[in-house]
């Protein structure tokens, strides 16, 4: 499989990618999935190469999908928590990045602070991938775009995100604007995406000819939506605000009543883990509209594409 390189050495943010990069990732992921479903479980593009996975936050889908992805590409993945490394005892990020670059061919980091991943990339001689930070979740957003196309075609589409303007929402808004898809965010005042992200979303939307809107009414957001997306109300790191967030976001629950205002063809997405009965009810999560498990599966194929394009 011949692969075209991306225009970036790292994947820290969707803002690192132009439209051609995004299309390349989606196209390569499609080829990987087709071959996987045809029974070709190992494609040794990264044979002999190693990926380090560093986790400051817990993970199920990100950890397992990256470990399996490296195996299916013929390489190896080594997983560490921050506390297992000298980072946990105060070693400078600069020194850790420089040293790990001598051992590994790539590093994926899940960190609390986006700035820590940016600093790591600054001193790394090998590709660095953001596996989730407080600002963005680019691997998830690329997977979401892949899943939307798989279910609904190339588009353009209208994506409604109902809930907190968190890392998942930020990256999804950026990828939608990049692809020329309309994005509507239903959110309580004060919980919108960070200004630095939204400015880039608006710039890309203007460039691609798509529309981005922030509304307060979830029913308005889903009325013309092809995709209704939600995520947890209390993200990792927001636990101290739990009770207040549960109160504020209660009217933003994705349930049967809200979905009755969406078009019949609209699909429901969630990056998982789900706090069932809060942001998403069981009857919707387990309905025919829900694509949550396909979405989770696609992390594997999209991340194989990301790894192959950055490390191949």
From Swiss-Prot:
This is Ornithine carbamoyltransferase. Keywords: Amino-acid biosynthesis, Arginine biosynthesis, Cytoplasm, Transferase. Reversibly catalyzes the transfer of the carbamoyl group from carbamoyl phosphate (CP) to the N(epsilon) atom of ornithine (ORN) to produce L-citrulline. The keyword Aminoacyl-tRNA synthetase does not apply. L-ornithine binds at residues 167, 231, 235-236. It comes from Methanopyrus kandleri (strain AV19 / DSM 6324 / JCM 9639 / NBRC 100938). One of its GO terms (biological process) is L-arginine biosynthetic process. HAMAP family: OTCase (MF_01109). It catalyses: carbamoyl phosphate + L-ornithine = L-citrulline + phosphate + H(+). It is found in: Cytoplasm. Pathway: Amino-acid biosynthesis; L-arginine biosynthesis; L-arginine from L-ornithine and carbamoyl phosphate: step 1/3. GO terms for molecular function: amino acid binding; ornithine carbamoyltransferase activity. Belongs to the aspartate/ornithine carbamoyltransferase superfamily. OTCase family. The lineage of its organism: Archaea, Methanobacteriati, Methanobacteriota, Methanomada group, Methanopyri. Pfam families: OTCace (PF00185), OTCace_N (PF02729). Its EC number is 2.1.3.3. It comes from the Archaea. Transmembrane segments: none annotated. GO terms for cellular component: cytoplasm. Carbamoyl phosphate binds at residues 59-62, 86, 110, 137-140, 271, 299. It is an enzyme of class 2 (transferase). The gene is argF.
């Amino acid at each position: 499989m011949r692969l075209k390189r991306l225009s970036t050495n790292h994947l820290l943010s969707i803002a690192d990618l132009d439209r051609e990069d995004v299309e390349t990732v989606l196209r390569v992921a499609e080829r990987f999935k087709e071959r996987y479903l045809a029974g070709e479980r190992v494609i040794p593009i990264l044979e002999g190469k190693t990926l380090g996975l560093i986790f400051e936050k817990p993970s199920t889908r990100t950890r397992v999908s990256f470990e399996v992805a490296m195996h299916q590409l013929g390489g190896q993945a080594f997983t560490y928590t921050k506390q297992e490394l000298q980072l946990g005892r105060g070693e400078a990020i600069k020194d850790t990045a420089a040293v790990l670059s001598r051992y590994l061919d790539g590093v994926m980091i899940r960190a609390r602070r986006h700035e820590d991943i940016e600093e790591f990339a600054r001193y790394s001689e090998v590709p660095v991938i953001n596996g989730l930070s407080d600002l963005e979740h680019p691997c998830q957003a690329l997977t979401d775009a892949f899943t939307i196309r798989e279910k609904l075609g190339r588009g353009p589409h209208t994506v409604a995100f109902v809930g907190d303007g968190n890392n998942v929402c930020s990256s999804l808004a950026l990828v939608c604007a990049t692809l020329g898809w309309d994005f509507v965010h239903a959110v309580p005042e004060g919980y919108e995406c960070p200004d630095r992200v939204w400015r880039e979303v608006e710039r890309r939307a203007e460039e691609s000819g798509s529309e981005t809107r922030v509304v307060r009414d979830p029913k308005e957001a889903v009325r013309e939506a092809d995709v209704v997306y939600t995520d947890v109300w209390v993200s990792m790191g927001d636990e101290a605000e739990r009770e207040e967030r549960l109160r504020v976001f209660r009217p933003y629950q994705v349930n049967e009543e809200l979905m009755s205002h969406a078009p019949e063809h609209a699909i429901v997405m969630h990056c998982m883990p789900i706090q069932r009965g809060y942001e998403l009810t069981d009857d919707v999560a387990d309905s025919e509209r829900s694509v949550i498990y396909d979405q989770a599966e696609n992390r594997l194929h999209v991340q194989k594409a990301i790894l192959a394009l950055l490390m191949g």
